[in-house]
């Protein structure tokens, strides 16, 4: 396997994936930070594409701050989620707020602290599960979806 990984590969033979990061920011009262995306109006976790020069933890802290104005301490990886339609692998981390003030950005039209029930009401299943997985303490979870529905493992 190591020999295979060290050999140059044809561009068409190796599938390319985008790596994104997202933060499940949990306040002491149990409310969860969410944004309404500016591009499509859906409610999701704050997050985005991991930059080449940053660690996943630094990336999630940057994305949460950029989209919400909230600084966070990153606790732990709670899930890995693959969008099989778009080729995106999302690393999701549970975080604690450590400062800042809620604000919108060019990527968000609303920032809100939701209860777990509100998460299920406002978010599509494939995004709500990321928050609910982070709360159950049994992670990290590994799941796949097609952008709309979870895909059963196996």
Mark where each language-model region is.
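Conserved Nudix-box catalytic region and its N-terminal flanking loop in Nudix hydrolases
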Residues: 27-66
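A short coil-to-beta-strand element that immediately follows conserved catalytic motifs
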Residues: 71-79
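Active-site-adjacent beta-strand/loop module that shapes the phosphate/pyrophosphate-binding cleft
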Residues: 82-102, 112, 116, 130-138
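Acidic, metal-coordinating catalytic segment for phosphate/diphosphate chemistry
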Residues: 1-22
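Nudix hydrolase/Nudix homology domain
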Residues: 41-43, 107-154
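Short, charged/polar surface micro-motifs in flexible loops or helix N-caps
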Residues: 26-31, 40, 51, 70, ...
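A structural signal for short, well-ordered beta-strand segments
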Residues: 23, 77, 93-95
């Amino acid at each position: 396997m190591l020999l295979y990984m060290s050999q140059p590969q044809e561009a068409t033979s190796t599938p390319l994936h985008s790596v994104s990061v997202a933060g499940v920011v949990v306040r002491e009262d149990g409310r969860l930070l969410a944004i309404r995306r500016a591009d499509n109006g859906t409610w999701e976790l704050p997050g985005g594409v991991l930059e080449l020069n940053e660690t996943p933890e630094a990336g999630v802290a940057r994305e949460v701050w950029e989209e919400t104005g909230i600084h966070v301490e990153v606790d732990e990886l709670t899930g890995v989620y693959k969008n099989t339609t778009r080729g995106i692998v999302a690393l999701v981390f549970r975080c604690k707020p450590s400062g800042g003030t809620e604000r919108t950005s060019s990527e968000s039209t609303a920032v809100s602290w939701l209860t777990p029930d509100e998460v299920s009401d406002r978010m599509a299943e494939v995004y709500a599960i990321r928050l609910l997985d982070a709360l159950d303490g049994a992670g990290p979870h590994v799941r796949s979806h097609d952008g709309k529905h979870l895909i059963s493992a196996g």
